[in-house]
Every structure is written in C-alpha cells, then in structure tokens.
Amino acid sequence: MCASGWNGAEKEKQSRKDIVRNEQLHYNKKQICNMRRDEQMQKKNYQKELDKKIEQIVSEKKVPRLFLHSCCAPCSSYVLEYLSEYFEITVFYYNPNIFPESEFEKRIHEQEKLIRELPAKHTIHFQAGNYDSEKFYEMAKGLEMIPEGGERCFRCYELRLREAARFAKEGRYDYFTTTLSISPLKNAQKLNEIGERLAGEYGVAYLVSDFKKRNGYKRSTELSKIYGLYRQDYCGCIYSKNQREREKKLREEEESSVKS
C-alpha cells in the first residue's frame, strides 16, 4: 500500500512505531557512546582489584562480614556462590524502584528461596528493606522520560547503595557492595564510583566489583535454571517496564506486518 492510501489509523500506528524506533535508536547510540567513554575513562580493573582484596583476606585467614545489596535473586545467585566462600554475608533486599508492589514481594520470596537452597561455606543471612516507593518517585521527578541506563538509573543506584551503606555502618560490617554490576545493562564504573564515595561518607569499606566479568552473568542464568528462579524481563521500575512493553509491541506489530 502506498503512503497516499493510508487512513488516519494506519498513519497513527506508523507514527507510534517511528517514535518507539527513534527512541530505541537514540538509546542504543547513547549506550554505545557511554560504553566507549567508560572504556577510555576506566583506569581501574575492578575484577582485578577484587581479586587482590580476596587474596589479602585469604592470607590473613579472616572471614569479614559483608552487607550485600541485592537487586533480585537471579543476579545474586552467582555473587553469593562466589563471595560466600570468603565472607559472612547478609543479603539486603532494598529496591523501592520496583513496580508494582506485588512484583516487589515476588522478588523477595525468590531471594529467600535462593538463600535457603544455595550451599554456602559461610552463613548467608537475609534482611528486607522497606518498600519506600515514594522515595524513588521523588528521586525520579523530571527524569521520567530518560531511557533506561541514564541519569535516572544512576540516581537509583545511589538511593539503594546509600541505604545499604547506612545499615552497614549501623551493623558494623567490614564491607558493603551490590549485585547490580552483574547485569550487562548496568554501569559498573558508575556503581563503583558511587560506592566508594559513600564509603567515605559512612566510614564503611566498599567492596569494588564488576561481577559480569568472568562469565558472571552467564553463570547467574545457569544457577537460575538450577534453582528454578523467576527471571523478570524488566529492571523493576515502571519506566523500564513501560519501555519493555513499547519495544515488545513494536516487535509484534512488525512481525504481524511481515506475515500479512
């Protein structure tokens, strides 16, 4: 059908598709630019730094206490398998960005299930944070339309890590860190910068990491299958959920047009 033959509904449909496609292209370009910038700026290899820290811990024959912020059970699976060999861990589930609240509760149950079933050399404890969704929405004001992976996400990192640092200080933990760097979509450089800055504020050491290295993400998918964990298809917040739904709808419309 030529463009002149389109009716109003078809034009509107095409317009929606163009908006979503342009939004995704813009996001992809921004992500590539950010990755290149981070590669140029990143002087630290966080995995190597973590290796050195663990070597030091082993040589001192200590078992430090680690306060580990977890975004979800699947992401924490590899991190717990890896770090429970060297640390006594408390998993801190604090994610006020999650939408809806039923999703928040579902992810808590999956986290508790994993902790019960995962073998660990040292004890793994669990602590659930409050569902402070109003804090997330206050933080996100004015950033609602920014694609996933931008400034809104960076502020969300800090919101969650700050709460982890606060509890780590109160509980007199040796270290705190987060599972977030295991995701290919999360900015490890930014996470570690925020973590180290908060360490200075709260007086608790931040355990630097880039858990996606050494096939960490791949191992998390394997462990998720082994333990039958629910793996969500969006980060957690309503904005990432809406973005995934728009992308899904676009794919379905394109597949439908090809078939017809």
Predicted feature residues:
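Short, positively charged and aromatic/hydrophobic N-terminal segments
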Residues: I19, Y27-R37
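Nucleotide-activated chemistry modules centered on ATP-dependent adenylation/adenylyltransferase
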Residues: C33-S260
